[in-house]
């Protein structure tokens, strides 16, 4: 049996009509103890409820309305023998409402033995409630009692016999000022809330007007505001003044009793502030925008048997961990402004718990619902199906919580996303929120790919009770039945703003790579994560692989063109003309090694002029260009039928290949674009082993491949090839180019006695045997010795290396095979002209050309053997612990088998 505790006594639960709050019970008990300090009658103590004495007082008030107040009776009858009480004093006791306080002799008449009022048996049988009487105007003696407290008599009879000290404390000016300030703040808060509601309703009305034909408009179903159960709790029919309500709230909160915290609100405000309690106070709740959040936060005010339900127990971990401190004002919910209408979701922009940013952008996307979330919103549906297509989506940032957030988020993140997907809300019979999820998904890629982004992939179709597997932060393929149309989902930029969740930078799953290779260090940008592909589906723009070469070879500034035989800027062009034609002698103040760049090119003219000569700038190249232009003009005047396009082509061709004497312009370009020295990063302090040597060679190969790409894209005419042909030529010829360049380095640095792969990786006889590729190393050393035997010049080496790039093609041909053949023929002619520059005898030129072409043919068998060796090593790399960089492994596994199978063959100058 539930009982009420008073001061010194235990009372049974009062009837429903006399059921009072904690505030009223407290002062009722205080009043009874003060007025009757003596022992009570046992029968009255056991049977009389706390409100019986109050009802007896009202009965006496109706019978003795004509009598004077108790204080005046005490003052006028001092000679009756009864002890006279002082009027004021620290220990004296007075009633709050003196007009309704019965006199002592009247109470003595009713029960002379015990001094207690009789039990209200007659009134309870007749059904008469507490009859309210209008208070009489107070006398002059009662002027100290404030008028506000005198109004509490009819409504709160329990306060009518409060002590003088308590009365004085409650009537202090500071307390009244505090109540007034609270009332003002409350009114200001209500005004701000009303303004926010009006603004949000206007935005929703604008969105509904612009929506597609009104088909996707938000239908708002009219429903009455829920009636709070606290009205019946306080008596229902009683009308409580504002001051009394505030006083009750202030005292109750100060005493830790939060039962009356929401009584001062209007019915509409009670819906907003108390919506978290509505579904559990009995009966099916009305349509409330905050109803789905009921199981997630708050406690139940009802003390009935429904307090310990499964729903409340299910979400108890989340209530204590996340929803602590939330009150009615912190919720992003408000009542609807429509008459009798249900409240719709209103999310202020200042709340961090709910989505607010994308709602401000809704004006640009009125036809859809945009809710920015990072994880799938999973959980049980609300008790009644919501008529609003976009209500109750709650947001949490997974980065703001600890490891326990994932379990809690699955319980409290759920919503009705019917407008985002064609259906698919979890059925009402689903179990825990973690086991069910909404099938509302959005596609990150195209509808054909069907790749989904999210923590779990749900099954489509919108069936009820379908269970899905939850995979946090996973990338899963869709199951059968889930199809994405282009117009069903918003663009990815709306779902994923800057900095929230990063997008997958690959157009398809086949392009995903596990790491970034060192070869991409010089290619940071939007295409930095891509690799070379064989098909056109994933081909990048040509400017990525082969951007134009526009850097001055002297100072590094932006080049304006080819001046005096070199690619230079306008400043270096003018400087070289004046310095070369002038008779002034320049002397460097330092050691002839000054730095010449864009900002310090004018500091040392001697070093700048020396660098111009090293780049190949000559005054004779200017004269040759003028002669070529004059010859073009004469040919243009002779033939009038030539089109302007053909004239431009002839002009470029003649200026490029006509009349070389000792320093052709073509060689200047080849010298300028020649790669520098690349190190392998090998640790020579460690003992040589097969795995260490081969791993260092693979790392060196990837680093050199970066320079090969940069060198090839700077070759004249190479960028005019088809983009597929460019990639194919590089992927097929990279091994021959590296072997040829390594042979030249071995010849120039160590006189072909060892293999000079890199400054930190030089192979001697011991390392050749240790690497298990001794036969290949011997052939490469023989190639290096050929450079010395044939006395190959640097100019011949540069031209032969460029020609070697165009010496291997697929058997089926390239995309633009005709242009490739023309470009290859031009480089062959350039090699022939370089040979003819230093040899006047035609027979000697032909013999030299034969020797150089035989040397080029000898590179192809060596490259083939190395292709076979690297392919076998890649297959056994896990067994022998040899590391292969990612790009090297890709090219060897994809392109090398084409060469070994005969689909790609080299082009030989001589019959093999």
Swiss-Prot record:
Its main location: nucleus. Phosphorylation by TNK2 enhances the DNA-binding and transcriptional activity. Phosphorylation at Ser-69 by CDK9 regulates AR promoter selectivity and cell growth. Residues 226-236 have a biased composition (Polar residues). Residues 1-550 are annotated as: Modulating. There is a cross-link at residues 838, 840 (Glycyl lysine isopeptide (Lys-Gly) (interchain with G-Cter in ubiquitin)). Residues 35-156, 204-236, 375-394, 452-490 are annotated as: Disordered. It comes from the Eukaryota. 17beta-hydroxy-5alpha-androstan-3-one binds at residues 698, 745, 870. Residues 1-579 are annotated as: Interaction with ZNF318. Residues 584-911 are annotated as: Interaction with CCAR1. Residues 379-388 have a biased composition (Pro residues). The keyword Aminoacyl-tRNA synthetase does not apply. One of its GO terms (molecular function) is nuclear receptor activity. Residues 551-624 bind DNA. There is a cross-link at residues 394, 513 (Glycyl lysine isopeptide (Lys-Gly) (interchain with G-Cter in SUMO)). It holds the Pfam family Androgen_recep. A zinc finger (NR C4-type) spans 552-572, 588-612. Binds DNA as a homodimer. Part of a ternary complex containing AR, EFCAB6/DJBP and PARK7. Interacts with HIPK3 and NR0B2 in the presence of androgen. The ligand binding domain interacts with KAT7/HBO1 in the presence of dihydrotestosterone. Interacts with EFCAB6/DJBP, PQBP1, RANBP9, RBAK, SPDEF, SRA1, TGFB1I1 and RREB1. Interacts with ZMIZ1/ZIMP10 and ZMIZ2/ZMIP7 which both enhance its transactivation activity. Interacts with SLC30A9 and RAD54L2/ARIP4. Interacts with MACROD1 (via macro domain). Steroid hormone receptors are ligand-activated transcription factors that regulate eukaryotic gene expression and affect cellular proliferation and differentiation in target tissues. Transcription factor activity is modulated by bound coactivator and corepressor proteins like ZBTB7A that recruits NCOR1 and NCOR2 to the androgen response elements/ARE on target genes, negatively regulating androgen receptor signaling and androgen-induced cell proliferation. Transcription activation is also down-regulated by NR0B2. Activated, but not phosphorylated, by HIPK3 and ZIPK/DAPK3. In the absence of ligand, steroid hormone receptors are thought to be weakly associated with nuclear components; hormone binding greatly increases receptor affinity. The hormone-receptor complex appears to recognize discrete DNA sequences upstream of transcriptional start sites. Transcriptional activity is enhanced by binding to RANBP9. This is Androgen receptor. It comes from Crocuta crocuta.
